[in-house]
């Protein structure tokens, strides 16, 4: 989702600029930067663990997840295509009874659990293209293993309302996801939930399309997808990338195909 746009000084805070005003720090720098952070009750409320070489050595149910949705802060972006990642976080929080009421590392956080698995729900409050500057320090501070960081974002290559849950992959030209990957040492080993929003019709400008709200028909498809996404995330957290996730992706792929 690359946007070839110049980035003058006056446009540094645009939600769709392509480059961050400062290069994103690598994971090793994030780890060192996390140390001075104030120890709050928030940190004591989530049981965090470092990555282990053998996933079987520690049951998945005791390993926390960092679940982040990408979007732009502010009421004027609410309900736009580029903010469906935020909507997914809100839907998970609602269905799992998690309150989003903590501010840390340029993010709005919710601490809770899915089943008995501790989860950290994250809505970065930097603009979407700088999401990694919020997610990277949080992952380092709470020592969440990379395989348990789920990023949820809008995807133009998928039809509106179609979801895809993957264990790893590239950034697919999505600038927000690319920034997150850069802040996590450019690793492709990053789970992600892609939320289809379709592509711009005709010659419509990509930026205008992303910052546009859904039509009534598209809104119904997205609302259904969000409910299905909550179920998929719950399955992922409780069972990992099992056969259930494979079946979910297959159903999503053909959900709008006529028989």
UniProtKB/Swiss-Prot annotation:
GO MF annotations, alphabetized: peptidyl-tRNA hydrolase activity; tRNA binding
Name of the protein in its database record: Chloroplastic group IIB intron splicing facilitator CRS2, chloroplastic
Q: Where is the active site?
A: 82 (proton acceptor)
User: What are the leading ranks of the lineage?
Assistant: Eukaryota, Viridiplantae, Streptophyta, Embryophyta, Tracheophyta
Region Disordered, residue ranges: 1-21
Mind telling me where the transit peptide is? 1-49
Q: Which family does it belong to?
A: Belongs to the PTH family. CRS2 subfamily.
| Protein's job | Required for the splicing of group IIB introns in chloroplasts.
The entry's localization annotation reads: Plastid, Chloroplast stroma
The record's annotation in InterPro entries points to:
CRS2-like, Pept_tRNA_hydro, Pept_tRNA_hydro_CS, Pept_tRNA_hydro_sf
Q: Which UniProt keywords apply?
A: Chloroplast, mRNA processing, mRNA splicing, Plastid, Ribonucleoprotein, RNA-binding, Transit peptide, tRNA-binding
The record's subunit annotation is: Part of large ribonucleo-protein complexes that include group IIB introns and either CAF1 or CAF2.
